[in-house]
UniProtKB/Swiss-Prot annotation:
The gene is ectD. This is Ectoine dioxygenase. Keywords: Dioxygenase, Iron, Metal-binding, Oxidoreductase. InterPro entries: EctD (IPR012774), Phytyl_CoA_dOase-like (IPR008775). Its EC number is 1.14.11.55. It comes from Bordetella bronchiseptica (strain ATCC BAA-588 / NCTC 13252 / RB50). It is an enzyme of class 1 (oxidoreductase).
Length: 308
């Protein structure tokens, strides 16, 4: 086991919070492993820690994806599974995990070359699905997701060694300024925020509803935001946001009348598979962090998302 003193990204120890310079590349292999993105797009991702591609999916594709996600949220057999997470204080579905396994069309989505090849290009290797989920924010009552770095959680609770993973968020509804869109801090991916507080056992059972550990301190957050600002990922349904595993992000609650729904695919490099979790923690379930049943994503030969 690597001690906190030897871990470049030690977090949730008895030490105080700290800002630590990133030790890993942002784009691996000079972005030449695949060719889904232009050189300018790769450069933008490397600089900011994220990339918004507008109108990547057609209206027909979006309609099929949204209908499937809505079906899943109404399916009692899915809602009562451990993969379904409800909002704090209600039975409204907040997230459904492992959607690429539970749904054939979402299984094709994770292999769509527009997503998978972009991930392979940025991460410089073959990739597998570390996690997939559908996130819903119903109008008037969708709750916020507080600021966090995914890598902080994946490093501590899942044993992910390095910052060689990314998320892509496929917008299934219009994301506007009022319905709780994703917010990211440009440039924050180059700094790791070490958090305080020992992780409780089975922390995931509460953190997926409301995260209280692995949360960056206000002083560090303010510094990152003053340096980089805050970018709001607004766009039409069918747009996609790719963002680095260490980019600081969050979203406000949705008190507007307009619901928001996104599907997230998390790709991890096949050269960055999980170690045991830190500090003797038990591994999180497979539907949250793929540890056993993983294989390289094989991109579809052509765009076959909607079968006719």
């Amino acid at each position: 086991m690597i001690s906190p003193a030897q871990d470049p990204y030690a977090s949730r120890t008895d030490r105080s919070s700290a800002i630590i310079a990133r030790q890993d590349p942002v784009v691996y292999g000079e972005g030449k492993f695949a060719d889904a993105l232009s050189a300018d797009q790769v450069q933008s991702y490397e600089r900011d820690g994220f990339l918004l591609l507008e109108n990547l999916f057609s209206d027909e594709e979006v309609a099929a994806l949204l209908a499937e996600v809505e079906r899943m949220t109404r399916d009692p057999a899915i809602v009562r599974r451990e993969e379904a997470i409800t909002e704090p204080g209600s039975n409204a579905v907040r997230s459904i995990f492992m959607v690429h396994v539970l749904s054939p069309i979402l299984g094709r989505l994770v292999r769509d070359p527009r997503l998978a090849n972009a991930a392979r290009q940025i991460l410089g290797s073959e990739v597998y699905v570390h996690q997939s989920r559908a996130n819903m924010k119903p109008g008037f009552k969708g709750k916020e997701f507080y600021w966090h770095s995914d890598f902080e959680t994946w490093h501590v609770e899942d044993g992910m060694p390095s910052m060689r993973a990314l998320s892509c968020s496929v917008l299934l509804t219009d994301n506007n300024e009022t319905n709780g869109p994703l917010m990211l801090v440009p440039g924050s991916h180059r700094q790791f925020i070490s958090c305080v507080g020992e992780t409780p056992r089975d922390h995931y059972k509460q953190s997926l509803k409301k995260q209280e550990y692995g949360v960056p301190d206000p002083v560090s957050l303010q510094l990152l935001a003053e340096q980089g600002g805050i970018s709001t990922m607004t766009g039409k349904a069918g747009s996609v946001v790719f963002f680095d595993c260490n980019t600081m992000h969050g979203s406000n609650s949705n008190i507007s009348p307009w619901p928001r729904a996104n599907v997230f695919m998390v790709y991890n490099s096949m050269e960055n598979t999980l170690n045991p979790p830190k500090y003797g923690l038990n591994p999180r379930p497979e539907h949250i962090a793929t540890r056993q049943a993983f294989k390289a994503v094989r991109p579809l030969d052509s765009l076959k998302l909607v079968e006719r």
